[in-house]
């Protein structure tokens, strides 16, 4: 065993052990630096889709419509689903914009959040289960509609920082009627840019409620409850 296999973290020593290569290792379509990639807890499913926020070189065989790929932890394909950018919530006619982020819930549902506030909830086979909206109708119809600036998916929902400085949250995402609510964070539309956001789930907080910690570029750390 070589000494350079080990890395020090304060007074703890650890090393990485190579177990196996994922099945997609030679697949040009699955280069991780081109994709948004999220992994479910405890060695669960891996979801990946082309990162629409990056400027990527595409070949003639590439489709403009992104494909959502769900794999097992060894890289074996579970499902592939072409994503229609214009998936709409009932009663709305606007597109949802680029995909900003996605994540797995505790119930292994994939939550996909778009920049204009549209949320898609899909199962492990990529089938659309439900759609939600983080932007209300009045804002959507205004000349400067609110947008999602940053977002985190947690075990039972999603939390988003909007361009207006509001923090919006959804809980009970697995239920037939998820709960939508706003959280007070003290951020305005002209606050310093966000540098980090962490979601503290109810089972881990003293209050027993969902809490969010926000850090801004000017060194402020704010809590939203």
Q: Residue locations for each model-derived region?
A:
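WD40-like beta-propeller blades
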Residues: 1-225
């Amino acid at each position: 065993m070589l000494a350079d296999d080990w890395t020090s973290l304060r007074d703890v020593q650890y090393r990485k052990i190579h177990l196996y290569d994922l099945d997609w290792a030679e697949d040009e379509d699955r280069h991780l630096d081109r994709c948004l990639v999220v992994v479910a807890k405890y060695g669960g499913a891996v979801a990946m889709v082309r990162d629409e926020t990056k400027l990527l070189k595409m070949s003639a065989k590439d489709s403009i419509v992104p494909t959502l790929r769900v794999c097992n932890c060894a890289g074996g394909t579970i499902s592939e689903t072409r994503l229609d950018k214009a998936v709409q919530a009932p009663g709305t006619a606007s597109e949802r914009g680029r995909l900003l982020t996605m994540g797995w819930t505790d119930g292994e549902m994939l939550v996909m959040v778009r920049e204009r506030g549209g949320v898609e909830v899909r199962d492990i086979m990529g089938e659309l289960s439900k759609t939600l909206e983080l932007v209300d109708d009045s804002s959507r119809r205004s000349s400067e509609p609110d947008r999602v600036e940053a977002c985190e998916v947690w075990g039972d929902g999603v939390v988003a920082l909007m361009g207006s400085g509001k923090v919006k949250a959804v809980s009970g995402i697995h239920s037939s009627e998820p709960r939508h609510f706003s959280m007070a964070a003290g951020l305005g539309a002209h606050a310093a840019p966000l540098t980090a956001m962490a979601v503290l789930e109810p089972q881990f907080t003293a209050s027993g409620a969902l809490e969010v910690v926000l850090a801004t570029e000017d060194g402020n750390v704010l809590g939203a409850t």
